Regions:
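Anion-binding (especially nucleotide phosphate/pyrophosphate-binding) glycine-rich loop
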Residues: 2-130
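Conserved active-site and cofactor/substrate-binding residues in soluble primary-metabolism enzymes
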Residues: 3, 24, 42-45, 103, ...
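Phosphate/pyrophosphate- and phosphate-bearing ligand-binding catalytic cores of soluble enzymes
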Residues: 18-19, 155-282, 286-301
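Structural signature of FAD isoalloxazine-binding scaffolds in flavoprotein oxidoreductases
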Residues: 32-33, 38-44, 71-89, 135-166, ...
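Short, flexible micro-motifs
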Residues: 35, 68-72, 105, 131-135, ...
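Short, basic and Ser/Thr-rich N-terminal targeting/leader segments
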Residues: 57, 64-66, 148, 219-220, ...
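A generic local secondary-structure boundary/capping motif
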Residues: 70, 109-112, 120-124, 137-144, ...
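Contiguous, small/hydrophobic- and glycine-enriched helical/loop subdomains that border
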Residues: 92-96, 100, 105-106, 119, ...
Length: 301
C-alpha cells in the first residue's frame, strides 16, 4: 500500500492532496470512480517534484486538465491523478501568449481578445484546459490548435523540462507528439495576429451562439464523442440510424445533436460504454463506417 500523503508531504500542503477522490467530480461527463490519490500542484516546480516522486515510487499516474473529452471507468483510477488546473499563468509577449496548461481554453481565448490578438476565436467555447486542447489538437469552426501553437514546454517522467517547436509537434487531426511520447504539457506559446478587439469579441460571441443553438451545453457531456470520418457527419449518421434520444440507463444520445452523448442523470461508465458500442455497431451496419472515439477512456477495467 502506497503512503501517498507521505510521498508528497515535503512539498505539497495537505489540502493539495486528496485520497479516494471521486473522478465524477472532475469530468464534464460527471462519471467515474475514485482515484487512489488526487494531487493539485500549483507551480511548475511542484509538478516536476510530483512526477519525480511517483516515478521513483513506480506509481502509475494520469494527467488531468479540465476533465473534458474524458470518460473514467466505474472502478476509478489506480495510482495518482495529477491535476494541472492550478497552473494559471498567462504572459503577453507582443503577438504571442504564453499560457500555463491549466488555464481554461475559454479564459485563454478571452485573454487573447483583451490584448487585441486574433486567431484564437475558434477556441472560445472549447471545454477543458489549454493543455488538453494542445494535447489533442482540439479544434472548431475551421480552426485548430495546430494553427496557433508555436512551441510547447513539457515535462518528462524524470521531471526534466523540454521545449518543442512547432515543427516537432507532429500535429494531425486530433493528434500531437504528446500522445506518442507521454510527456506532460506544462505551458504552450501561441502566436496570433493583431486585430480589432470589438471584431474579435463579435466573432467569439457568434461562435458561442452557434454552440448554444446546436450543442447540449446545459447537459453533462464530454463534447463530440466520436472523431469525424472523412466524408461523413457523425451526428447525421447516428440520427439516420434512428438513435437520437436512444439511451442505455442514463447514458443518452442528445436530442439536440446526435453527435453528443450526455449523462442525463446518474449514468455509469458501463452505461456510456454500452451506448458507444451500440452506436458503433449500428453505424457500421448502416454505413460500413467504423467510428473511432474521440473521448479518452481511462481507469481500471
Amino acid at each position: 500500500m502506497v503512503a501517498y500523503t507521505e510521498l508528497f508531504s515535503s512539498f505539497l500542503r495537505r489540502n493539495q492532496i486528496k485520497l479516494n477522490e471521486p473522478m465524477s467530480r472532475h469530468t464534464t461527463f460527471g462519471i467515474g470512480g475514485a482515484a487512489d490519490c488526487f494531487v493539485m500542484p500549483e507551480t511548475i516546480e511542484e509538478l516536476q517534484k510530483v512526477i519525480v516522486e511517483v516515478t521513483k515510487a513506480n506509481v502509475p499516474f494520469f494527467i488531468l486538465g479540465g476533465g473534458a473529452n474524458l470518460l473514467v471507468r466505474d472502478k476509478g483510477i489506480r495510482g495518482v491523478v495529477i491535476y494541472t488546473g492550478r497552473l494559471q499563468s498567462i504572459i503577453h509577449e507582443g503577438n504571442r501568449l504564453r499560457v500555463a496548461a491549466g488555464v481554461s481554453t475559454a479564459k485563454a481565448a478571452k485573454a487573447a481578445m483583451e490584448h487585441g490578438l486574433s486567431g484564437m476565436e475558434f477556441a472560445a467555447g472549447i471545454p477543458g484546459t489549454i493543455g488538453g486542447a494542445a494535447y489533442m489538437n482540439a479544434g472548431a469552426y475551421n480552426g485548430e490548435m495546430a494553427d496557433i501553437v508555436v512551441s510547447v514546454l513539457s515535462c518528462n517522467q524524470n521531471g526534466q523540462l523540454s521545449v518543442y517547436n512547432k515543427s516537432k509537434l507532429h500535429y494531425d487531426y486530433r493528434h500531437s507528439l504528446f500522445m506518442e511520447n507521454g510527456e506532460i504539457i506544462v505551458e504552450i506559446t501561441v502566436e496570433l495576429a493583431p486585430g480589432n478587439i470589438h471584431d474579435i469579441e463579435v466573432m467569439m460571441e457568434e461562435f458561442n451562439r452557434r454552440r448554444r443553438m446546436k450543442q447540449p451545453l446545459e447537459k453533462k457531456s464530454a463534447g463530440s464523442t466520436f472523431k469525424r470520418p472523412a466524408g461523413y457527419f457523425v451526428g447525421q449518421m447516428i440520427e439516420e440510424m434512428g438513435l437520437k434520444g436512444f439511451a442505455v440507463g442514463d447514458a443518452k444520445v442528445s436530442m439536440k445533436h446526435a453527435g453528443f452523448l450526455i449523462n442525463d442523470g446518474h449514468a455509469s461508465c458501463t452505461d456510456m460504454m454500452n451506448l458507444i458500442s451500440e452506436i458503433k455497431r449500428r453505424v457500421f451496419d448502416g454505413y460500413g463506417v467504423e467510428l473511432m472515439t474521440e473521448v479518452q477512456i481511462v481507469g481500471e477495467e
